[in-house]
Amino acid sequence: MLNQEKNKFVFMITQIRGRLIEKSPTEVVVDCNGIGYSINISLNTFSKIGSDENIKLYTHLIIKEDSHSLYGFFEKSERSLFRLLISVSGVGASTGRMMLSSLSPNEIVSAIMTENVQVIQSIKGIGLKTSQRVILELKDKVLSLEGSEQQELNLNNESSEAASALEVLGYSQKQTSKILSKIITENPGINV
């Protein structure tokens, strides 16, 4: 077992590699040396799993008094985001999986970074208070996720000219960043 102080999780099964036996939008069964593991997945992971017979998933094991549940993710960054989401009070594993099924990890990170309550609240089962709590508790933490720095860097490079123009018009740097991030998130192909 690996104890990581940073997240205060104890990880026992961190990945599974094996033969794909069954696949549905909510779970897969992976045969690993004769043992079939039932693994809960998000729609995001489901969409990335091909029809290949061999599969590798990064996992998170949740042990409760009455159940052991294994959650699988196609990418480490999705697993990291899941772990952050379930660290928020009021967000359990099912809600975390629902969030990752409703929005892509990049959309969730972007909504948190831009404090876009409406995007997070649009997810089934997430109310106003929970969406505000997710943003408040994770805003600083999502920057440590793999890919978030790159996303922010791309946002800065793409929109530096637009940001300068908005600042000349009197908007603060924080307001400018929020506005441009929202525009780029809502219109991914747009050139600002």
Where are these regions (language model features)?
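Short amphipathic alpha-helical segments at helix boundaries and their inter-helical linkers
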Residues: 110-113, 184-192
